[in-house]
């Protein structure tokens, strides 16, 4: 110190240098930190969610395009200084040039190129800033992001606040409101699962980079849960979504959707799911670093969210949630009912990195009960009741109970059981799901239920067997029964397909195909026997074992064999 004091020239030099250093930041002349964008204020950058955002007015660009970039602050906040650059995604080098018109902004030279960056001219308070960026007219261009350093005060600043990615397409296509789809490698990945992030996938432990039919989500949360990196991946033609829920049912959930807009580009949306209708789309909020891709039919997204997770329409105070994956189709940018849904079996602590393994009880017991009741209704009681009414009216004719023939009592009893079981199955699956699942299966199931209820109502008002109009009822009753049977078989096929989404062998569908062939064979044999009887009028009606009775016995044994196989399959699904 004495040396400095004894040398007035040296003291003057130090004072001028310090003064120049301070002034250089107040007037925004910060070209020396173009690479790091880090203010030399002697303080560390903030890691909390910034109260400032940077947005672009376009989502795609080509050579020579101009993009308006806006820096905004949240209500109640202002910034004194800033530094703005455009950078290719994953690069630390600036690209393109800026132009400004306002007096509170200036252009800086970075990487030896003028107008590569924009900064402030004074430390006056600012709420919003706009600048125009012009893309290069040549060179190796790629997707870009606008990166900003916001200075709230000398010791409070945020570095590297990024906009959503702007896609280079070289064809001049621009967008106005959606996050574009980038053509990139898989952005959701296994590395870090269990060590730095929570991962949930179906099938368990599938790898989105190598597995087929893999649905995958990952969440990497900061220690105070103010920031989360979210990854989503799944085979879908419309969207993949992740939900944060307080329970295992859809409703009152915080949701992020990675789906196609009306131009076929991927967009990330923030939504709140009420469980009874299409999720309500919210403002995207503080979401940055968006990367999206479609690879081999798989939708693929990652982004950083600084939004608070909100369930039951209020901000949650916990870090434990059930994670949900949903996927399905979209139409004109609107998501449709999901065709695939998976939920963790327990709540997941987002601050505790783990690999979530769901129990083998993939399908809720009520869904399995629904499937079993439907199979029993239309592979056993319903099928047997129908074949008795068609081919066994002559067996034990004149004998019966309650004044009715045995065939009639058996037919009515079996069909009544079928309708009751169908109604129970219909109710419990809606109670379990809580909403409309979408797809062909529920439509077919509703048609089966409606026509099944019509059948006994019409039968209750039928005319006497000798009435001249009786044939009208007979034909209507038979045609409706045939329609119910066809729809029920189709519903079973589509239902089994839902159980077998990850069974590459698909054995239950093959068993159902075998059952269909078996039943067709039995009907053909019964019909041939009926025709033979009509030709041979001398056939004794009192034979101890008539051919139709033997065929009925075989029919029941075969149906039960197929039924038991499918019941076992559903039970172990």
Curated annotation (Swiss-Prot):
Topology class, membrane: Multi-pass membrane protein
Pfam families named among the record's database cross-references: DOMON, Reeler
Domain of life from the UniProt record: Eukaryota
Keyword annotations from UniProtKB, A to Z: Electron transport, Glycoprotein, Iron, Membrane, Metal-binding, Oxidoreductase, Transmembrane, Transmembrane helix, Transport
Binding-site residues, heme b 1: 370, 441
EC numbers: 1.-.-.-
Matches recorded under Gene3D superfamilies: 1.20.120.1770, Reeler domain
MF terms (GO), sorted A to Z: metal ion binding; oxidoreductase activity
Cofactor dependency: heme b
Cofactor comment text: Binds 2 heme b groups non-covalently.
InterPro entries per record: Cyt_b561/ferric_Rdtase_TM, DOMON_domain, Ferric-chelate_Red/DefProt, Reeler_dom, Reeler_sf
Domain Cytochrome b561, chain residue ranges per copy: 332-532
Keyword Transport carried by entry: yes
Family, as annotated: Belongs to the FRRS1 family.
Known role: Putative ferric-chelate reductases reduce Fe(3+) to Fe(2+) before its transport from the endosome to the cytoplasm.
Protein name: Putative ferric-chelate reductase 1
């Amino acid at each position: 110190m004495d040396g400095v004091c004894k040398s007035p020239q040296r003291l003057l030099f130090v004072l001028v240098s310090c003064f120049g250093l301070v002034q250089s930041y107040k007037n925004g002349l910060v070209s020396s930190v173009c690479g790091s964008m880090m203010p030399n204020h002697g303080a560390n950058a903030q890691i909390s969610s910034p109260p400032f955002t940077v947005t672009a007015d376009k989502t795609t660009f080509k050579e020579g395009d101009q993009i308006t970039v806006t820096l905004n602050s949240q209500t109640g906040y202002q910034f004194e200084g800033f530094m703005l650059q455009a950078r290719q995604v994953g690069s630390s080098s600036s690209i393109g040039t800026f132009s400004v018109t306002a007096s509170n902004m200036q252009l800086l030279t970075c990487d030896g190129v003028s107008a590569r960056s924009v900064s402030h001219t004074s430390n006056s308070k600012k709420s919003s800033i706009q600048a125009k960026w012009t893309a290069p007219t040549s060179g190796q261009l790629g997707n870009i992001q606008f990166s900003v350093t916001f200075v709230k005060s000398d010791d409070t600043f945020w570095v590297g606040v990024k906009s959503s990615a702007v896609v280079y397409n070289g064809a001049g296509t621009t967008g106005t409101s959606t996050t574009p789809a980038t053509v990139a490698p898989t952005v959701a990945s296994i590395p870090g699962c269990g060590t730095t992030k929570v991962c949930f996938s179906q099938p368990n432990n599938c790898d989105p980079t190598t597995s087929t039919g893999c649905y995958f989500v990952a969440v990497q949360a900061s220690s105070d849960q103010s920031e989360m990196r979210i990854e989503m991946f799944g085979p879908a033609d419309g969207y993949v979504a992740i939900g944060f829920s307080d329970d295992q049912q859809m409703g009152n959930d915080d949701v992020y959707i990675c789906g196609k807009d009306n131009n076929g580009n991927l967009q990330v949306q923030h939504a709140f799911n009420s469980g009874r209708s299409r999720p309500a789309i919210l403002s995207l909020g503080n979401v940055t670093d968006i990367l999206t891709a479609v690879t081999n039919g798989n939708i693929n997204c990652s982004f950083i969210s600084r939004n608070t997770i909100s369930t039951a329409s209020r901000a949650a105070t916990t870090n434990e949630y059930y994670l949900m994956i949903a996927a399905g189709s979209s139409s004109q940018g609107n998501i449709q009912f999901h065709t695939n849904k998976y939920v963790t079996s327990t709540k997941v602590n987002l601050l505790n990195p783990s690999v979530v393994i769901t129990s083998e009880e993939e399908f809720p017991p009520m869904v399995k009960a629904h499937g079993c009741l439907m199979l029993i209704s239309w592979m056993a009681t319903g099928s047997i009741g129908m074949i008795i009414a068609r081919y066994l009216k002559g067996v034990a004719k004149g004998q019966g109970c309650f004044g009715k023939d045995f065939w009639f009592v058996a037919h009515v009893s079996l069909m009544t059981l079928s309708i009751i079981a169908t109604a129970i199955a219909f109710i419990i699956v809606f109670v379990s799901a809580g909403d409309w699942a979408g797809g062909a299966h529920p439509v077919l199931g509703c048609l089966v239920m409606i026509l099944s209820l019509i059948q006994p109502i019409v039968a209750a008002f039928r005319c006497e067997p000798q009435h001249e109009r009786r044939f009208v009822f007979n034909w209507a009753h038979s045609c409706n029964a045939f329609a119910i049977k066809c729809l029920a078989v189709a519903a079973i096929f589509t239902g089994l397909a839902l159980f077998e989404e990850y069974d590459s062998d698909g054995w239950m569908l093959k068993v159902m195909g075998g059952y269909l062939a078996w039943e067709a064979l039995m009907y053909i044999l019964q019909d041939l026997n009926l025709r033979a009887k009509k030709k041979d009028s001398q056939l004794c009606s009192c034979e101890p074992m008539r051919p139709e009775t033997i065929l009925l016995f075989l029919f029941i044994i075969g149906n039960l064999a197929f039924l038991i196989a499918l019941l076992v399959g559903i039970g172990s699904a």
